[in-house]
């Protein structure tokens, strides 16, 4: 969500702060701002909209200073306006914040009763006023910071400047991540190591409850009670270069076409293609002995987990409990400490997923992380890390991370089946051969279907509602298709299990309703054809995504049929993801939306 950066050193910082913010654009934002201290005075520039607007403002009114903080805001309290953009100022205090101050209304009333005048609608402004109040009461800067942290409740990553201290940035973390970068004669602060990669690869991650005093030559870190603590330094592998679009119009398009390559890379970490076998999974989690598995995630990662559930239950005969992370820990699930739990998150910082992880950890479960960011909080707090190795994914709507999550889950399920003795050596070899074929088939599909997809997408762009249907692993894929379409084209779409059509959604079917049916010719195909006949009988416009055998067997008059190669069931979800992603992408292009940064969405959701 919001992005935070800070620099304290001997060189001008404003341009470097904006460059660092560009590396956080993938998180999503609606306004931005920078504050520096120059000649003993706090100064700031803010702008609504994209960073180019802030850059334009800085060209007109440059900011000097060798210390500063900057922020990209994703609105939670108050409209996305320049007035509500961070940094917030009051009485010589500047604050930027990622998170939600849950008791801000109570604090605001208290501060207003004491004479504080609020200029914005945000929850963050109470932090600045609290700090100013404690300074007026005679507390020093560190004491004021500690006192403020004792009062605020909720999730926060904070960076603070005091006008009377032009050599120090203060920071605090409770929930959203913060990384401190160590330089030569200068220090850095960022929401993640990616923002700091051009400046340093030596990183210290704050943990929940930590707060820090950062100077030019070092940092002092304290826990919530004010005790001095040490946090380890580590070398970050985050790339120092900004990823570009290459010859593609959008990052999302580029990332769709990268899938054959990144999936081949990911699978190479989990399977031995020469011997056609899976490599040993994990020493930390014994999949051969766990009685059950819990999976929790959000959004697209949750839908990957739903598909993974089918695989673990089918190939490993392992019972799987799965729920969206925002609900998982509220259900009081009877969890066995002998069991294991997998948490799926591209960023590794998803707040609800992290909270569910900690819930399972408290109950004694072994924890596995399926993440793209190996230095993330979820990875660091897990017993075993299963990297998806998708590389940087900039588009807010997940594409290559989704299919890499699926590839890793498929390999883990086969490995679990081998460990549990539920698949034979011959079955293992056959499944691995199918996985090995996947990158080639994906490349073949991507090179052949675009003209048909573009034609169909032009028609979809004129629709107001779209229904997706699927059975088996195609059911979560139908939900993913609907999610992708509404995320980036803003067309209302819903994904349903095909067997649920008669239990409500069929009431929506008419001649204006496109129904996208994902139906490889598998053991569910005949039943799905029956559902398509029900749609056709009511004038619905069927778009069938199937394989050669399915196209021949359906015998239906469809609006469009997209024909894919026949593949093994274990790789079908990844292959059938491709037309689903391209349909959403090209429809959004025809709609003229911001494909890479759709409205109201954030790449990394770091608050609950």
From Swiss-Prot:
Residues 281-422, 456-598 form the SIS domain. Its main location: cytoplasm. InterPro entries: GATase_2_dom, GFAT, GFAT_N, GlmS/AgaS_SIS, GlmS/FrlB_SIS, Ntn_hydrolases_N, SIS_dom, SIS_dom_sf. It catalyses: D-fructose 6-phosphate + L-glutamine = D-glucosamine 6-phosphate + L-glutamate. It is found in: Cytoplasm. SUPFAM superfamilies: N-terminal nucleophile aminohydrolases (Ntn hydrolases), SIS domain. It is an enzyme of class 2 (transferase). One of its GO terms (biological process) is UDP-N-acetylglucosamine metabolic process. One of its GO terms (molecular function) is carbohydrate derivative binding. GO terms for cellular component: cytosol. Signal peptide: none annotated. CDD domains: GFAT, SIS_GlmS_GlmD_1, SIS_GlmS_GlmD_2. The active site is at residues 2, 603. Catalyzes the first step in hexosamine metabolism, converting fructose-6P into glucosamine-6P using glutamine as a nitrogen source. Homodimer. This is Glutamine--fructose-6-phosphate aminotransferase [isomerizing]. The gene is glmS.
């Amino acid at each position: 969500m919001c992005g935070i950066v800070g620099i304290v050193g001997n060189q001008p910082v404003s341009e470097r702060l904006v460059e660092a913010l560009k590396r956080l654009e993938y998180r999503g934002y609606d306004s931005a701002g920078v504050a520096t201290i120059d000649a003993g005075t706090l100064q700031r520039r803010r702008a609504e909209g994209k960073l180019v607007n802030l850059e334009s403002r800085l060209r007109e009114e440059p900011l000097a200073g060798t210390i500063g903080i900057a922020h990209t805001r994703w609105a939670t309290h108050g409209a996305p306006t320049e007035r509500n953009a961070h940094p917030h100022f009051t009485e010589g205090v500047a604050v930027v914040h990622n998170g939600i101050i849950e008791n801000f209304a109570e604090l605001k009333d208290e501060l207003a009763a004491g004479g504080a005048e609020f200029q914005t609608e945000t929850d963050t402004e109470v932090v600045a006023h609290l700090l100013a109040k404690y300074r007026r009461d005679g507390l020093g800067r560190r004491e004021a910071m500690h006192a403020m942290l004792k009062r605020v409740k909720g999730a926060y990553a904070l960076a603070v400047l005091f006008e009377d201290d032009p050599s120090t940035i203060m920071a605090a973390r409770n929930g959203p991540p913060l990384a401190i970068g160590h330089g030569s004669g200068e220090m850095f602060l960022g929401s993640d190591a990616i923002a700091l990669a051009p400046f340093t690869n030596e990183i210290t991650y704050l943990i929940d409850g930590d707060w820090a005093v950062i100077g030019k030559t070092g940092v002092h870190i304290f826990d919530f009670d004010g005790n001095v603590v040490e946090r380890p330094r580590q070398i970050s592998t985050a790339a120092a270069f900004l990823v570009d679009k290459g010859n593609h119009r959008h990052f999302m398009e580029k990332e769709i076409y990268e899938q054959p390559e990144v999936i081949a890379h990911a699978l190479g970490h989990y399977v031995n293609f020469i011997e056609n076998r899976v490599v040993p999974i994990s020493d930390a989690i014994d999949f051969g002995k766990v009685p059950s598995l819990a999976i929790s995630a959000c959004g697209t990662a949750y839908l990957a987990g739903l598909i993974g559930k089918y695989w673990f239950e089918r190939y490993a005969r392992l019972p799987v409990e799965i729920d969206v992370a925002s609900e998982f820990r509220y259900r009081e699930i009877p969890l066995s400490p002998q069991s294991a739990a997998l948490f799926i998150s591209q960023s590794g910082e998803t707040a609800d997923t992290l909270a569910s992880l900690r819930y399972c950890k408290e109950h004694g479960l072994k924890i596995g992380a399926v993440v793209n960011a190996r230095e993330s909080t979820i990875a660091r707090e897990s017993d075993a890390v299963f990297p998806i190795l998708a590389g940087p994914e900039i588009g807010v709507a997940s594409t290559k991370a989704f299919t890499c999550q699926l590839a890793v889950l498929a390999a883990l399920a086969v490995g679990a089946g081998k460990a549990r003795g539920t698949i034979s050596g011959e079955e293992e070899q056959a499944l691995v051969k199918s996985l090995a074929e996947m990158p080639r088939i994906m490349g073949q599909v991507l090179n052949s279907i675009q003209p048909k997809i573009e034609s169909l997408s032009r028609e979809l762009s004129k629709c107001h509602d779209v229904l997706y249907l699927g059975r088996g692993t195609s059911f979560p894929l139908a939900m993913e298709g609907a999610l992708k379409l509404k995320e980036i084209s803003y067309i209302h779409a819903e994904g349903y299990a095909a067997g649920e059509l008669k239990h409500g959604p069929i009431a929506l079917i008419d001649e204006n309703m496109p129904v996208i049916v994902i139906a490889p010719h598998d053991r569910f195909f005949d039943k799905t054809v029956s559902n398509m006949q029900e749609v056709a009988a009511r004038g619905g416009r069927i778009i069938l995504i199937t394989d050669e055998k399915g196209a021949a067997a359906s015998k239906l008059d469809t609006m469009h049929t997209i024909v894919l190669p026949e593949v093994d069931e274990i790789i079908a979800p990844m292959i059938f993801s491709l037309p689903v992603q391209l349909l959403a992408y090209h429809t959004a292009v025809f709609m003229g939306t911001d494909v890479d940064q759709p409205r109201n969405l954030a790449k990394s959701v770091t608050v609950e």
